[in-house]
Amino acid sequence: ANFYRMTGNLIPDIDPKTREHREPWPGGRTNHYYHDLNRDGSWQTQKETQYRLKLYKEWMPHVHVDYHEQSYNEPYYFAPAVEPYHELITPWQREFQNIIGNNNADYFDKRQLLYFRNEDFDLLYPAYGDTYPIYNGAIGMTYEKAGGGSGGVAVKTSATDTLTLKERLEHHYLTGLATVEATYQNSERVIQEFQKYFKKYEKDFLTIAKAYDTFSVI
């Protein structure tokens, strides 16, 4: 946002070669110390992560979506994720990703909106914004909309369409409501499986931690 305020025109220029669409390194992804906070979930080396996860633990959500943006030439991405999945991810966590993904797809299909799933974004590394919730019993997912720091207010894509900030907001809003709807429709099962997750792992947590000592969930 600060970069666009400094470089954007009063009338948005959709040409991707213009200054307002060419944010310099390191962009807006990192914190002040150039640390990628979307790789810090399990390690919690940064203050921002520590405070965010303190709040997370106060709520312990059953379903958690990590909203992102990607290249402005990409269609929308939502769950389910691509393999590999870590073997500690439960069958229910896999199943409900598909339930939510199918509901998102229904809404996108009705509006003839482009999207993809099962092709990118794994669930193996434990410190992402979607995998940290998964290793804490939730249904964790990443949603990615085209745009990012290069999107500005409006930009022409490689398909010669014009992608606007308004469109980006609307698509995230749409998947948000679709996710809430799918969760509501399966609320009893969501609650039961969340409880089952912790009942199971409180019994054999030490065994699992010893077997998978390459990372720890704090």
Which functions belong to the PLM regions below?
Residues A1-Q97:
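Active-site/substrate-binding loop(s) of hydrolase catalytic cores
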Residues R19-G28, Y72-Y76, G101, I191-T207:
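Short, composition-biased local secondary-structure segments
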Residues T45, Q93, Q97, G101, ...:
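Generic structural signal for well-ordered, non-membrane alpha-helical segments
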Residues E48, R52, I100, H172-T179:
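Alpha-helical packing segments of well-folded alpha/beta enzyme cores
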Residues Y51-Y72, E95-F121, P126, P133:
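Active-site-adjacent substrate-binding region
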Residues K110-I218:
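Hard-cation-handling environments
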